[in-house]
Structure formats: structure tokens, C-alpha cells
């Protein structure tokens, strides 16, 4: 990312951060070597994914009836004994309170039930 693009992204994030109905996060993608193992580790959502990822709370109004809108989904995967951290609980609560679909999946069936598919 060029210096100009970095400055622009910072300015956009500051401006958008003033809106309580928005939650956006910087999404850097790439690969780096793990300093412990030397193996390459990918990070970020996916190659080609956008710089800012998040959600906007939208109130559904009568004129929107029949339209399709995307809904943010956040599923935390845990083993049978795995426990959510406070940070993970806070994340899920914020997404849920903003209208997203959230849940903890310990099995494939859990994930399917969370998404009602």
C-alpha cells in the first residue's frame, strides 16, 4: 500500500468511526514466516478482500420489503470444552446487537442451526 493510500485509509477510518451504526476493521492480507517455525502463515480474510471489513446497522423500512440485503455472519468455532474469551463474547454481542447472525459452533450441526440452513 502506498503512503498516500495509507493516509487516505486512516482518514476514512477516522471519519467513519464517528458513526455509531458502523463497525469497520482494517483487513490486511498477506503471508509472513512464523518466527518459531519458519513456515509461511497467511493472514487476513482472503486474497483480494477489501481493506475495510465490517457491518452497518440498517433499519428495515416498508419500502425495503421484498428486497434482499446481506447480513453479517460471525461464527466462533470451539471444541467441546473450548471457552469463549471475554473479547470473543464482546465481539459476538456487538455483532448480534447490530443485527448480525452470531453463534458458537462446536459441531457442523451447530453451524447449520445458527444459520438456519
Question: What positions do the PLM features span?
Answer:
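Catalytic phosphate/metal-binding cores of nucleic-acid and nucleotide-processing enzymes, i.e., regions
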Residues: 1-117
